[in-house]
Amino acid sequence: MFMGEYEHQLDTKGRMIVPSKFRYDLNERFIITRGLDKCLFGYTLEEWQVIEEKMKTLPMTKKDARKFMRMFFSGAVEVELDKQGRINIPQNLRQYANLSKECTVIGVSNRIEIWDRETWSSFYDESEESFEDIAEDLIDFDF
C-alpha cells in the first residue's frame, strides 16, 4: 500500500527520484500514465494487470469509454528505476501534468501520483476546505 507525501525534483533530463518508501513495493519496473486532475498515476505491474482487466469490461459502444481508454492507455509507459532510484518521465507525460522542476509524489492506496508541486498545493488547499463534507457524503463506513 502506498501512502505519504514526498517532495522531489525533476532534473534537466526529465528524471525524478522515486521516494525510497515506494521503491520496494513498485519493484524495479512499473507503469506510469495520465491520471485525473492533471497528475500522473503510477501502478505496479501486478496492479496494472488488474486495471487492464477492469478496463476491458467497459462498453466499446460508449464514446466516453473509448475516449477514456485511449487517453489512459496511450499515455502509459513502463519505467525502470536506475541505480540511483530515478525514473525517466517522458516529455508527453511531463507536459500533460505540467511538471516543473519541483514535484510532489503522493501515495494513494494502490497507486502513486506525481504532481507538479504548485498544482498539488492548489489542489490540496482547495480539497482541505471540504475534506469533512466529502467524507460525510461519500464514505459509508467508520474509521
UniProtKB/Swiss-Prot annotation:
NCBIfam families: division/cell wall cluster transcriptional repressor MraZ. Its main location: cytoplasm. This is Transcriptional regulator MraZ. Forms oligomers. GO terms for biological process: negative regulation of DNA-templated transcription initiation. Keywords: Cytoplasm, DNA-binding, Repeat, Transcription, Transcription regulation. It comes from Staphylococcus saprophyticus subsp. saprophyticus (strain ATCC 15305 / DSM 20229 / NCIMB 8711 / NCTC 7292 / S-41). GO terms for molecular function: DNA-binding transcription factor activity; transcription cis-regulatory region binding. Residues 5-47, 76-119 form the SpoVT-AbrB domain.
